[in-house]
Amino acid sequence: MSFDDGVVKAQTDPFALKRGGHNVQKWTSYALFKLFKEFRINKNYSKLIDFLTENFPNNVKNKTFNFSSTGHLFHSLHAYVPSVSDLVKERKQIRLQTEYLAKLFNNTINDFKLYTELYEFIERTEGVDCCCPCQLLHKSLLNTKNYVENLNCKLFDIKPPKFKKEPFDNILYKYSLNYKSLLLKKKEKHTSTGCTRKKKIKHRQILNDKVIYLQNSNKNKLFELSGLSLKSCRHDFVTVESQTRAGDEIASFIRYCRLCGMSGC
């Protein structure tokens, strides 16, 4: 697919405005990408602000540039990369300040390099119906999500499905963007948190002064864990007949106290 730097179709361009009787120039995402690339390389942040303000005034408000209803047109400006998490949403606006743009461009260096190589892939590959690299990223993400879902639903007696790589996945791996690895880690984290065991809590009693010196304790008895009494036993001895070995006809007579169990003479 080769990119046309000229006019885009009206239905794909959100800036069909008229100023002074003339149509505002209609931009393609690739044409804007090449301009944004020059601004990044030359670090012309003030010129970039002037360019956005002059050409897209309807998206500028209070030194803020909004991306509402712009489609893929400005994805290369902030190098939008879809996230595996549903909590991370697409950026809706940026501040038109030189310090902010310098920080934004510095934080998205690798993402913009990824966009550059994906644009080159789209341009040299026939049959790729995409106008923005984020469409390829979404395709790779969707393919990986389907693979992980099929992996979760597989039966034990059926071979697991094979992961089918996209032709451009190697470009993603080059910039450490591996949706398969990220989604599998997310799956493992989800299963491990769902099967967590409850930790057993041992309640230990510490022998402190409050336990030892009980005011209401019985003075005639020791502490509970000994199980003995201070009073002497009033023995009540009994004699029983017991066979000491199995199959032995000899029986022994044992004399013991039935109260404390002490053997008698």
Curated annotation (Swiss-Prot):
GO biological process: DNA-templated viral transcription; regulation of DNA-templated transcription
Protein location: Host nucleus
Any single GO CC term annotated in Swiss-Prot or TrEMBL for this entry: host cell nucleus
The keyword Transcription is annotated on this UniProt entry: yes
Pfam family, any one: Baculo_LEF5_C
Keywords: Host nucleus, Transcription, Transcription regulation
The keyword DNA repair belongs to this UniProt entry's keyword annotation: no
Quaternary structure (record): Interacts (via N-terminus) with itself.
Entry's family note: Belongs to the baculoviridae LEF-5 family.
Known function: Plays a role in the transcription of late viral genes. May function as an transcriptional initiation factor.
Protein name: Late expression factor 5
Biological classification of the source: Viruses, Viruses incertae sedis, Naldaviricetes, Lefavirales, Baculoviridae
